[in-house]
């Protein structure tokens, strides 16, 4: 003998309590003798009954809305985390730390994007900033990041990676609805490639240059003018990556979006990022995780927690060591290896 268990729909259960409250109020009004009286006491009791029923209905609706909002945030948080996924603490000998904050309250991901991928061509990183901020920019972030994650493995040349990103952005803008102001859409992008020997090459489309931390010295990685941002203008024919020196063992790169340096205090003063970095490493070099924590704490103090734009930070430190040949005049070159500290990527 089979038993079929019928499940009552959740919506029916949710409506049961307010329906019962409403029925109780109507029954009281129509059937209770006290409700038919016109005395002051009867009026007070009747008002109290209807007030209690109304309060119960309001609380029930509020609880249902809060529960639904919590579920929506959980789904949105999972989707956003899949889009801008947490980076592993170590990538091919590099110690990595990253964090971002959306200007839209309740959104985990905004218009800033970053990714670091180990490939056969070297460690490749991207840092970008979509025009606008918050949830409205997520579609463009998804298009650029998706193209980057595929292109870095397929393309041996960094210039061809950038062209793939440009084509992905162009497709995304063309697929937007006619009501969106796609003519004003643009994305700043910084592409970096760090070879096994620490050699850095870069392509920069309108993005702030990162800072290079060597011991307690802080300086920009490059000072050349970047290319225009992706979107408004076509890329030039020649996309030769710019050599930017070497990331030696112990050196760090600090990538950031313009929301960091554009953050203002109550008096309208901009955040002095280079000075903050110099203060962070004044005594001794610190880990990427500590750099990110220190900078975010300084930003919160500077703006009093009122950021007007999305902000993102990405720190890469070369934890590889070099092995030199012991015998003088021995043939061969130094080979990069890695050691095994156990850093954390949690802030």
Give residue spans per PLM region:
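Conserved subregion of the PPM/PP2C metallophosphatase catalytic domain
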Residues: 1-77, 81, 88, 113-122, ...
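Acidic, Ser/Thr-rich low-complexity segments on the non-lumenal side of membrane proteins
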Residues: 81-119
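Primarily the active-site beta-strand->alpha-helix module of PP2C/PPM metal-dependent phosphatases
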Residues: 107, 113-176
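Preference for bulky hydrophobic residues occupying beta-strand positions
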Residues: 98, 125-128, 192
């Amino acid at each position: 003998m089979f038993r079929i268990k019928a499940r009552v729909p959740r919506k029916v259960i949710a409506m049961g309590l307010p329906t019962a409250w409403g029925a109780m109020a109507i029954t009281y009004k129509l059937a209770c003798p006290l409700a038919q009286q016109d005395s002051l006491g009867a009026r007070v009791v009747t008002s109290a009954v209807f007030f209690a029923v109304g309060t119960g209905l309001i609380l029930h609706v509020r609880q249902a809305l809060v529960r639904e909002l919590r579920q929506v945030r959980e789904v949105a948080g999972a989707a956003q985390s899949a889009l801008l996924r947490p980076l592993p603490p170590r990538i091919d000998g590099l110690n990595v730390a990253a964090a971002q904050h959306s200007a839209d309250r309740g959104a985990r991901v905004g218009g800033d994007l970053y990714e670091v991928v180990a490939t056969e061509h070297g460690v490749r990183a991207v840092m970008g900033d979509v025009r606008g901020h918050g949830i409205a920019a997520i579609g463009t972030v998804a298009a650029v990041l998706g193209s980057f994650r595929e292109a870095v493995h397929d393309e041996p040349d960094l210039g061809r990676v950038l062209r793939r990103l440009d084509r992905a952005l162009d497709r995304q803008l063309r697929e937007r609805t006619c009501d969106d102001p796609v003519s004003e859409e643009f994305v700043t992008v910084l592409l970096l490639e760090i070879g096994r020997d620490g050699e850095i090459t870069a392509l920069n489309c309108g993005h702030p240059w990162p800072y290079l931390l060597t011991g307690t010295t802080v300086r920009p990685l490059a000072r050349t003018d970047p290319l225009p941002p992706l979107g408004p203008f076509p890329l030039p024919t020649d996309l030769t990556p710019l050599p930017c020196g070497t990331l030696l063992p112990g050196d760090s790169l600090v990538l950031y979006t313009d929301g960091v340096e554009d953050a203002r205090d109550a008096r309208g003063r901009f955040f002095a990022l280079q000075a903050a970095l110099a203060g962070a490493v004044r005594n001794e070099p610190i880990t990427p995780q500590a750099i990110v924590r220190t900078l975010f704490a300084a930003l919160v103090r500077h703006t009093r927690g009122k950021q007007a734009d999305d902000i993102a930070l990405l720190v890469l430190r070369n934890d590889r060591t070099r092995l030199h040949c012991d015998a003088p005049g021995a043939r061969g070159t130094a080979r990069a290896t890695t050691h095994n500290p156990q850093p954390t990527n949690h802030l």
